[in-house]
Amino acid sequence: MTTVARVARGGWDVESASTPIANRARIEQVETNVDAPTTPEMLFDSALELRHESGVALRFEAEDALREWVKLGLPAIEVAAAKTWRRSHVERFGDASIAATRDARGGEGVGTSADGADGAALPPGPSMTSWNTTERSAEYDWTFTTPYGGTVTTTSDSNRQPPTWELTDRRIDRAMLTERDPILMYDELTLYESELDDNGVAHLGLKVRVMPKCWFVLLRFWLRVDGVLIRLFETRFFCDFTEVDRTGAVVVVRETQRREETWDALHARGAPCDPTQFPDADQAASVLLAAGGPVDIVTHALTIAP
């Protein structure tokens, strides 16, 4: 059952929809739409949309996030388990590209001698103890890492072009976010998640909060490949209803922080390397922040003319 939350404030109409896991037909449709070889096991049609009275909207959804994953095309992580993971994933969830992969590899694929004499399914992927850097899977980035930063659109009855994100020296007003104002709306959504066949987790989700003077969104992609690396992309969006420039324009600030650490680098700095220490994005963020590793930060502004 779909659960909807909605509030209107400061010229914005904010609406979130939380849905069950998508069915197979919807998953296949997404794979076709974004030209993806597969999708995460848990894919949701949940979405958040923030519509401004000018007709400009900022939307967050799994399909567009996966489209950005395909475009990014990161090289696959070099682990011995990668190919086995992919093939067992295909056995369990399907993969429209398997026929092409089999042909390209001279017949190696599901249902061939590579799987067993009787074409039986492969067992689940190996445990974390088998991860190493001795073999490269060149199929695709099976971690579903996405640089997604939301989708900017305009309503169908608007003749304007969607505004674009521009680099800025503006900052999110964190003091305003800590004020004891009432929370008019709060929601958390999962857009997609994969357990990487018990070898870690990849998760994309968001939190939204609307208050009397502003709204705030935290979009997080986080990845844990056990024994290999931790990756965390955090993108924060903020709009102050009380701030309008001299032209009457409204500004949305987007701050992106990207952190990535190998298991070895964390261990060298004394950080915990037990997967149980990273059960979710909140814990991963705390450990990575405490470890003091490298972080890339960039800030953009979206100016919405009246």
Model-derived segments and spans:
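Anionic, Ser/Thr-rich low-complexity intrinsically disordered regions
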Residues: 2-33, 42-43, 76-144, 148-161, ...
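A eukaryote-biased signal for long
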Residues: 130-306
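Generic detector of ordered, mature protein regions
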Residues: 20, 25-27, 63, 234, ...
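Intrinsically disordered, low-complexity segments enriched in small/polar residues
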Residues: 8-9, 53, 71, 92, ...
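Short linear, low-complexity motifs centered on an aromatic residue
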Residues: 61-82
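Amphipathic, interaction-prone secondary-structure segments
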Residues: 28-65, 207-210
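Residue-level detector of high-confidence beta-strand sites
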Residues: 17, 57-61, 220, 232
